[in-house]
Amino acid sequence: MLLEAAPVPDERTPLYVPRSWVAMAELGRAFVGRRTELGRIAAAMRHPDLSGAALIGEGGVGKSRLLTEAVRQVCRRHHFVVCAAACQATSSVPFGAFAQHLPPEFTGTAFNGGSLRLAADALIGRAGGRKPVLVIDDVHLLDPASLALAFQMARRHEAFVLAATHSAEAVPDPITGLWTSGMAEWIEVRPFSREEVGEVLEHALGGPAEGMLVQRCWEATGGKAFLLRELVAAMLETGTLAPADGVWRASGPFPVTLRLAGVVDRRLAGLGDDCRRVLELLAFGGPLSPDVPARLVSRPAVEAVEALGIVEVTRLGDREQARLTPSLYGEVLRARTPRLRARRVREELAAALEAGPHAREDLRRVVAWRLENGVRPPAESVVAAMRDAWAHLDHELSAELAAHAVAAGQGTRAAEPLGYGLMFLGRAREAEERLARLPRPAAERDRARLACVRAFNLAFGLDSVRAARALLHSALRDVAGVESRAEPAAVLALLDVATGRCRAGAGLAEKVMAEAPHDSRAHCVAEVARAVALAFLRPPEESFPALERAREPALRHQAELPWLEFFLELGWVHACLLTGDFPRAQARAAAAYDRAVERRFPFAIAWFCLLRALAARARGELREQLHRCREGVAIARELGNRGLLALLLGQLAHGLALSGQTAAAREALAEADEPAQRSLWLLQPWTELARSWVAAAGGSPGASAIAERAAALARESGAAGFESLALHEVARLGEPGHVLDRLGELAGRAGGDAAPQYAAHAAALVTGDGDALAASSAGLERLGSPLLAAEAAAEEANRHRAAGNLAAAAAAAARALRLAGPDGARTPALEALERPRLTRREREIAELAAAGMSSKEISLRFVLSVRTVENHLQRVYRKLGIGDRAELASLLDLFHPGSHPASGGDMNRAA
């Protein structure tokens, strides 16, 4: 038999449930954000003068879900909820929306004053003394009798009306009247923000989503909850969405399933041919000047689709742009357009743009459409389009157009878009092969630039530092002109800095800056290289101004050399980290990451994931560190970028070690070491510090010695700030006496606030002075590192406890637990923290008392006598060394079970 009947499943047969079904269910249940809206609903229900709240918003933004959550969180406990069934079918039946809540005789009852009073009394009677809440979705579909009933009960304060309607629909006059008379709150429900889309995805998928996936989903759906649910289901159903390295990622374009297409079809149902034609043009060509579809179709059609909210017209500078909103409609329309018709649409768009006034970016699209249709544009047009695509970070298109330019004999002009474009696409080996085959340029300047792009790709794409350096030296021998030599020399200076030779790199950069024209690319690259070197070598009063001066030239040349931003932000973040401004470091890294996500630039995202992870590490935000490492690892692995991958794996190992996942940490560190990266050796001390914490997590002896080797690496390169940080790690790992003198020396040399605080912490650890540890904790908190402050407070608590000062010990322990936060980092100091030894019942009673509950209320909660509760509290006071509830309230953090791992882990034996 070709087909066999499937066995009938019994109760023991596991049923396969598609992941898309699970995600759909989770997305349906997910409720994130909307705290403001829920708060306004709750406040309106408490307000004595208000009898209603109306939720207004576009279709699909989540008004119905908000109603459901409001009922669950706000209404259920103290109110009688009456859900109306407002729909087209009941809109002509008197009291039809409330039929299920009224006696049978009301169905079809004549609508008059008497029937309104009887219906209101029936609902009030069913409420059993509670105030009714009339919950009405799609209030514009209410039948007149039900609408009048809701309005009258609200006017008389007999019920609270909680209604929702589409912003495109006319809100019924009675509901509007409640608002204009000051009896109802008017609440606009907006689409999800990008951050909220990320929260929804994480909730539904059971793990974090990469930033670019969140950005794409937010742009595609416009933040509308309904479309987001359908899009995620389509991606899961087709396998487009899958986890990689602990983070959810999407591959390729969004899939268009029959279900997703049906959703869009229903939204566009009823549109005339002209309106559909406008949408088709925008699907293939958007954003477009609205004049283009107006010429090709008609202006009334363009105005009609804009009025329907399907097309959005915005102004960019002095130009208007029309685009589909949400953009997912364009994905669906393109996917469903037959091949020959799509070709005709592209040709019409190309001809229309060429015929009218157009901007430079229009040429890029025209060339792309022509090539997709199999038409070869003129070489000059291809080169111009290529450079524009490169400036807009469209690496796929710039590399494709560069290949066409090479075929047309324009290889010299195509070298940078070809080489950098392929490198950033994760095709660095192909980039080197194709660049190496290009004919030798005749002009010195062109030969120098070809050498620069090849060297950059060799170093930061293939991690072949020696080959990159040899190529740059060869270029310097090959060209004689000062300006031609300046650019390879500047890139060589940058390579020196990146590989940890900061002094040599800074010296070479200064020489280039002295010889090259101030507005040249060479001067800019050299200035960035010098600024990054100073971030590691000099105190903040020198490094920060240098970084600030490099910002303007880097922005000026960003279209040609987008990697300038990578190094400039690397310098900024490290300058902040090494001098003790941790919040600023985190803010800069996050802003750079957001820009990369908005540009959909994976290489840059991975780079800035590393910087975000380092900043999170400094602040002790373990979950954030792991999230950014996993996201960066997934991207770097896909791109095949060895240097970035190794550094990200090192930070991942560090985060895993601190979270107690020792085996996974060892595995990540082993992968980071095979083979060791070279192109970003400047950052290798971070990996060595990670190695020390992995050793500590496994209880291996000598963890502090590994951290000392990291400090030695930093010392060799002249990075006093980094050396100070690494020596402080030695102190944290249990050997403060070994590094105390050197930390004292660096406190006066490194600059900034970090080095003095590290030295003070080490000194307090050596002396064991509780007051000094308290001062150190406060100082470390001012740096912006709650974790370091928590460690000092934990050490203070143990010193006070050993001295018999129980009250001070309890206060310090509570502070340590509060500062450590919910991430549960496992460090020697925190694992050694001794909590007061309270029984389970003592802890429960103490927590309630600290939260403000009276002994009488506590006794009722546990069915105990008041005297028993007081006796428990007295024992708690004695164990904590305090005298009353007022002191107990300040120790609330002590009583949160699971706020930190139990003490006594392997790290206490690792130093």
Summary of predicted features, one role per range:
Residues 18, 96, 118, 145, ...:
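Alpha-helical sensor/transducer elements of the RecA-like P-loop NTPase core
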Residues 61, 65-132, 141, 254:
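Conserved phosphate-binding/catalytic loops and adjacent sensor/switch elements of nucleotide-binding enzymes
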Residues 52, 66-70, 74, 99-100, ...:
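Extended alpha-helical scaffolding segments used for macromolecular assembly and cargo binding
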Residues 93, 319-321, 359-364, 397, ...:
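Alpha-solenoid helical repeat architecture
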Residues 21, 61, 196, 200-204, ...:
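Short secondary-structure boundary elements
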Residues 67, 71-77, 140, 178-179, ...:
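Internal alpha-solenoid helical repeat scaffolds
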Residues 10, 814, 828-874, 878-911:
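Helix-turn-helix DNA-binding segment
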Residues 2-3, 12-41, 100, 255-258, ...:
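Conserved adenine-nucleotide phosphate-binding loops and their immediately adjacent elements
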